[in-house]
Amino acid sequence: MGIELLCLFFLFLGRNDHVQGGCAMGGAETCEDCLLIGPQCAWCSQENFTHLSGVGERCDTPANLLAKGCQLTFIENPVSQVEILTNKPLSIGRQKNSSNIVQISPQSLALKLRPGLEQTLQVQVRQTEDYPVDLYYLMDLSASMDDDLNTIKELGSLLSKEMSKLTSNFRLGFGSFVEKPISPFMKTTPEEIANPCSSIPYFCLPTFGFKHILPLTNDAERFNEIVKNQKISANIDTPEGGFDAIMQAAVCKEKIGWRNDSLHLLVFVSDADSHFGMDSKLAGIVIPNDGLCHLDSKNEYSMSTILEYPTIGQLIDKLVQNNVLLIFAVTQEQVHLYENYAKLIPGATVGVLQKDSGNILQLIISAYEELRSEVELEVLGDTEGLNLSFTAICNSGVPFPHQKKCSHMKVGDTASFNVTVSLPNCERRSRHVILKPVGLGDALEILVSPECSCDCQKEVEVNSSKCSNGNGSFQCGVCACNPGHVGHHCECGEDTLSTESCKEAPELPSCSGRGDCYCGQCVCHLSPYGNIYGPYCQCDNFSCVRHKGLLCGDNGDCDCGECVCRSGWTGEYCNCTTSTDPCVSEDGILCSGRGDCVCGKCICTNPGASGPACERCPTCSDPCNSKRNCIECYLSADGQAQEECVDKCKLAGATINEEEDFSKDSSVSCSLQGENECLITFLLTTDNEGKTVIHSIEKDCPKPPNIPMIMLGVSLAILLIGVALLCIWKLLVSFHDRKEVAKFEAERSKAKWQTGTNPLYRGSTSTFKNVTYKHKEKQKVDLSTDG
């Protein structure tokens, strides 16, 4: 018992505890009402768990109830339950007795569902080996199928031989169809009724709807003999009455010979489309097809001219109900039509038939192998209001959500399906649901019942002393009052109870329509939006106006329909701040002096001003330059003339204040260029009325130049430059002289003079020879004379 309670405890904590307050706000007054609110809700049946006004608090999530002090044993929280009634193991390998074959597990179970809670079941399907096969060959015998009839005369033997490789228990039968024997589907002259082919001329059988010719048998030669004896017939329009034949072949179980424990294959062979639904109204037939067997003593369809063609939906119901798998063998021209039919019919396949049915054998074998390689679940029974979802786990082991079919399976492989079932609401009735593999006789039967009641409802104290001395019955921790008494403990009588004391005004509803009047006092309802309070439940904390989707702009508290703003906020929505900080421009002036600060935003009043702080104003004048006349007048005027400057300052919208008691942090510094290159500096501020005030006016003018000092300085500079140049010249000359002297001394030291000879001396006598004078002596005389 302790382990069970511990498991329940963790179950309670883990289930839907994210839903906070949804159960308690539902206003449930009984355990059953609480369960209907949602699957996350539970009821506390513990006595004296809540006070007078809190019966609804008994309904909450399990975790919340535990937190409130409810003991675990008193928490009513029924869960969905699954009871497996029959669960035989799946058959393995070949079975000698086909009646003992089990291909689905489990076979039956009972399911109790808590509304809103999902319950998952696992279903396993395994196709057994060597499963018996019943094949019924349904052939179109209209005139266009004459060559096909000749081709299949030996089909029985060939088909039995091939199928023996796949199963040791094979039977086959034969039936044929043409069309409803009534105008306008056939010609109605006596000659053409007797012989529809008389215009060719050729003899053929009269038009007929459906004939069951050979019941299912394992005698292949008998099948061949029957086929050889068949004759064709004819009709007018191209579509045939094949769907009439399919319906009769599916529902006439005894006459066809379908076995309960075999695979039912219905091979439909035709080269034309089929009539269905209301096509027979052309012939005046208006009675809907009843889906019953109507084969007469001659095994012919007796209601062909009375009942309409079956609809696709009717065919689906009967084929699934009788586990018949349909194989459409049709010509290439008709394939696209029958593929559309096959998409709607569970287990149906389509094969392309050659003109003369030459490939019919291979077509049947291929279709059989395809059907045996697929496992698909079909849902039957009362599923209205029931939510079902499937997840297929095929031989690869990979789950495929929202799929109830496995393909490419081998015989003997196990296909698993997780089936999730849920009920959206509580309906006081049980449902019978069947899950079956398409084409197989095995099925899982499920009895689904709603779980909407509490165990504590079984224990009732009638006329309990806990309910004001027997004025009611005590059940699940609360009182159910007898007639004439009301109140949570049945303490008030209806004859003495008046609701007038619960009305704020005579014309208003009791407790403002948001509470219940118990013994002359209002007990306000719980609301998921907030608290309802007041002596008449007239107040709440959630009905105030909203700003940008937030209650009281998220800057105040809602009290009885009105916003109570927090500090720093005002307005009906508490969306208006009292702070002016957002309105101060970069120069420190409120709205740049061009507007008013309202709710933390600047409303520009100067024409042309814009921007968050009215800082942009192409048409506005410079605030500093606009005060030039006022400032210059103030600086140039003497004591009496300053009064004349007041008017100029008024025109500029400013006043001059020589006092120093102002905040320099919020001031604007201005500089103006005046006459004689004087620089005027002053500060601008705004007073409480928004007017401009001028402070700290200063004028700084440059001094005139000192000409004598400038001339003296220039003269001294010229003199100094001259002296410097002379010094430089002297240095250069001295450097050159020293260089020459050094060179001379070096040359002198290298010379080697002869004794008594001055190397620097040059004689004063020079001798020249006259080349034209030939007398040598005279030359000598001349030379000596010269010397």
Swiss-Prot record:
Domain of life: Eukaryota
Domain I-EGF: 456-491, 492-538, 539-575, 576-615
Region (Interaction with HAX1): 730-757
Residues annotated to bind Ca(2+) 1: 144, 147-148, 271, 355
Membrane topology: Single-pass type I membrane protein
Signal peptide: 1-21
Domain VWFA: 131-371
Extracellular topological domain: 22-708
GO biological process: one example: integrin-mediated signaling pathway
Topology feature Cytoplasmic, residues: 730-787
Main subcellular location: membrane
Sorted UniProt keywords: Calcium, Cell adhesion, Cell junction, Cell membrane, Disulfide bond, EGF-like domain, Glycoprotein, Host cell receptor for virus entry, Host-virus interaction, Integrin, Magnesium, Membrane, Metal-binding, Receptor, Repeat, Signal, Transmembrane, Transmembrane helix
Transmembrane segments: 709-729
Function: Integrin alpha-V:beta-6 (ITGAV:ITGB6) is a receptor for fibronectin and cytotactin. It recognizes the sequence R-G-D in its ligands. ITGAV:ITGB6 acts as a receptor for fibrillin-1 (FBN1) and mediates R-G-D-dependent cell adhesion to FBN1. Integrin alpha-V:beta-6 (ITGAV:ITGB6) mediates R-G-D-dependent release of transforming growth factor beta-1 (TGF-beta-1) from regulatory Latency-associated peptide (LAP), thereby playing a key role in TGF-beta-1 activation.
Domain notes per entry: The VWFA domain (or beta I domain) contains three cation-binding sites: the ligand-associated metal ion-binding site (LIMBS or SyMBS), the metal ion-dependent adhesion site (MIDAS), and the adjacent MIDAS site (ADMIDAS). This domain is also part of the ligand-binding site.
Family that this chain belongs to: Belongs to the integrin beta chain family.
Subunit-level organization: Heterodimer of an alpha and a beta subunit. Interacts with FLNB. Interacts with HAX1. ITGAV:ITGB6 interacts with FBN1. ITGAV:ITGB6 interacts with TGFB1.
The name this protein goes by in its record: Integrin beta-6
Species name: Ovis aries (Sheep)
